[in-house]
Amino acid sequence: MGVPSFFRWLSRKYPKIISPVLEEQPQIVDGVILPLDYSASNPNGELDNLYLDMNGIVHPCSHPENKPPPETEDEMLLAVFEYTNRVLNMARPRKVLVMAVDGVAPRAKMNQQRARRFRSARDAQIENEAREEIMRQREEVGEIIDDAVRNKKTWDSNAITPGTPFMDKLAAALRYWTAFKLATDPGWKNLQVIISDATVPGEGEHKIMNFIRSQRADPEYNPNTTHCIYGLDADLIFLGLATHEPHFKILREDVFAQDNRKRNNLKDTINMTEEEKQFLQKQNSEQPFLWLHINVLREYLSAELWVPGLPFTFDLERAIDDWVFMCFFCGNDFLPHLPCLDVRENSIDILLDIWKVVLPKLKTYMTCDGVLNLPSVETLLQHLGSREGDIFKTRHIQEARKKEAFERRKAQKNMSKGQDRHPTVATEQLQMYDTQGNLAKGSWNLTTSDMVRLKKELMLANEGNEEAIAKVKQQSDKNNELMKDISKEEIDDAVSKANKTNFNLAEVMKQKIINKKHRLEKDNEEEEIAKDSKKVKTEKAESECDLDAEIKDEIVADVNDRENSETTEVSRDSPVHSTVNVSEGPKNGVFDTDEFVKLFEPGYHERYYTAKFHVTPQDIEQLRKDMVKCYIEGVAWVLMYYYQGCASWNWFYPYHYAPLATDFHGFSHLEIKFEEGTPFLPYEQLMSVLPAASGHALPKIFRSLMSEPDSEIIDFYPEEFPIDMNGKKMSWQGIALLPFIDQDRLLTAVRAQYPLLSDAERARNIRGEPVLLISNKNANYERFSKKLYSKENNNNNVVVKFQHFKSGLSGIVSKDVEGFELNGKIVCPIQGGSLPNLSTTLILKMSYRLIPLPSRNKSIILNGFIPSEPVLTAYDLDSIMYKYNNQNYSRRWNFGNDLKQNIVPVGPKGITQYKPRTGGYRAFFYFAELSRNNVQPAHNYGRNSYNSQPGFNNSRYDGGNNNYRQNSNYRNNNYSGNRNSGQYSGNSYSRNNKQSRYDNSRANRR
């Protein structure tokens, strides 16, 4: 989700929420790599359910950052299998595995998908042009480029969208690989695998959320089920908190470890040797992973969100929901973030401070089970609005200081390298001589870049080649025309700037030339607008200038928002910004409206709406009211989406920008209602989000709608579109100002083509259902196979409802819509990889549906749960409550949890911060079963702190009294001694005399 740097900020502020994954390495015997034993105990602790957001796996496998991309789609799918298998060997779920692929998204998400895919197509075009230029330069120096390399084009990642042939092949491949593992891996015998492919509407992570909500509604659900979700998106943290499941963690790659990796640019990957590819493959396979523990985050938040003196009872679950809601204002995939809020500037802390001030004055919390309390929200935003001007001024001062500090460090670095000299001026007049040494008539005006590019022609021209002389003269005349209006004063100014910033003079002059090209293009466009109003060509020189910036921006994006370089390297890496025409708005190019708005100066309110919406001052008030109404509807929709499911498939926010915080007033009595509607079909979404350049992913009958000038919806697919940097530094952070889709016009045009679809194309344009696959060792195999696939039963409408107790899964199953047979065969859909066809005698495949929720989902901890042992020390809690770190989060690249802290004991507790009672009859039977089977509870984080005896570290369960005799290492929950040694005893924890204050704070809370 669109919350840049949220994970980085969160892990720095709450360092103990993360810990490294303990990954077993396969053994190598006689050069053969032996697979890991999936059934062996997990060094990270046992896990019940694992959820995979498959798009987070497919994308990096299709275009990896540290190695050349796969040559074919089959290689991509094999890479997906390998990566998924590695994740499963780390997590080792024992009961349920859910693979969720993004299906058709709500309209609110489509706008963001549309912007991403249009920019992705543009980046792919730039990369292809860069490849061609690199190959041309290499051929000029005599290098031979193979035809296979020359003709290869970058694979279009926009194919990873529901309805494309690739997604259809991905679904078949996942079903095959799951069946293969169930049939061949003994460790999978009890695993139940649900695959929700792209034909099932909804985003992958929210399909997972719907699954968890459905399981919690089952009366037989075990409240101590352990959950883990894999993915890099920031919203997975919100989703983990929104489930209110106490045993939840997130598995993700360690992005901190990536920072020191060598990254390969475009030139490196064109003619890479096999040895280099194998090295990168090994380096990529060694990418470390880490856990993010939601239960530890809840511990931090229990201290962070504590507010004394409330007129109502403090409820941690409601407070966490309010915290999640406030984070939405800093960024999400459905709404633009408020201009005054940025996670990197500790905006969440600003909102939290306001929340703590206003909460005692309110009657209740801001949210309840995903529903907003609008008067409370208005109070919060009004207080934020009163701080908005100061926030903008502080941001401007900090950015100026960072820029000054960077330039100072850069100058010192250059001086130490002897680079503080006057920059070399590019040769402006290059004299040419004939073969007899006579001076040629006239003179050439060539830049250094021209001389490098025309090196071969210059050599031939010196030898008297007329064709080469003509080509060089053509470039010289072109430069003369461009330099005609640039005065000597401007040249001197460029030299001065180059001296001041240590930039290359040629680059500064090139920018001046390109700026003039912008003016010439604009004049030509106005003259020829009657002839051609839609086709605007970009000059070759502009493409060359922007090429390096685009590639560098992609590298910076992969490094995951490296803050220190974001504010400092823009002047070299960001594209040239054009002048903003606030009266009508630019038609293409990259610009920055914030250069005109100047949010840090008085009067920014009117300038903001004038520059970004091109309205007159008289129309601002009406625009403001409508934007505030739509934005509040949006945050209500987002909150409902996270806690209850999609409230409306057709609602979307109809603006590219958010209102200012000072404008949020007068909405407390707003009545918010949503019409649920229905999701688009896959082809309808493809036509909504894909650019014309990606039309190859659609059936041919739709492509003319995207490219023909007489198409009734041609205006939805602009070839050029403006990008507003909106005050950001890197090009990927800019806002693509694309026209919003008119749903009625689009659906009318698309549905008129449906009768022309082939059967195969029509099969990809459906709303499907998830499938459930189990092995013949599963507890439900006999029941399901007999009722659904027996020869005596020919009724295709038979459904079987089953509940959680027997297998840890509940739902409704029916016959597989693809015609699964008990004695059939599953054909491998992938060429290569030596994967065999499978017999279906060892597995069972069924259509799967969730049990409908009887009522609204409640945001509570379920009765009968068993809390984990606390991980945080008194000092950790004090540092949050009393802000010892003063908001300077300095964890850097170290883990808050080391390996020892990752292995924490888990056991029943008599005193807990949660309101529902602990234990109960479910816990009694749960522990009785554990004792009989001599196994560890599934919500442990490790095994090293347990001895060979069953139970919880030599503790004894005394009937139903919730009285436990704990090991002396954990007596009275009050720790003392050396914090690093892990040995705790006694009744107090002594650390800088902080314990007394901590005890007093706990007493006050009670």
Curated annotation (Swiss-Prot):
Effect on the protein of changing L520P: Suppresses the requirement for XRN1 function
Ranges of biased composition (kind: Polar residues): 939-956
Keywords: Coiled coil, Exonuclease, Hydrolase, mRNA processing, Nuclease, Nucleus, Phosphoprotein, Repeat, rRNA processing, Transcription, Transcription regulation, Transcription termination
Region of interest: Required for retention in the nucleus: 492-529
Sequence repeat segments: 955-958, 961-964, 972-974, 975-978, 984-986, 996-999
Primary site of residence: nucleus
Region Disordered, annotated ranges: 561-584, 939-1006
Reported effect, K535A: Causes mislocalization to the cytoplasm
Cofactor(s) named in the record: Mg(2+); Mn(2+)
Basic and acidic residues: bias regions: 561-575, 996-1006
CDD domains from the UniProt entry: PIN_XRN1-2-like (cd18673)
EC number: 3.1.13.-
Assembly behavior: Interacts with RAI1 and RTT103.
Name of the featured protein: 5'-3' exoribonuclease 2
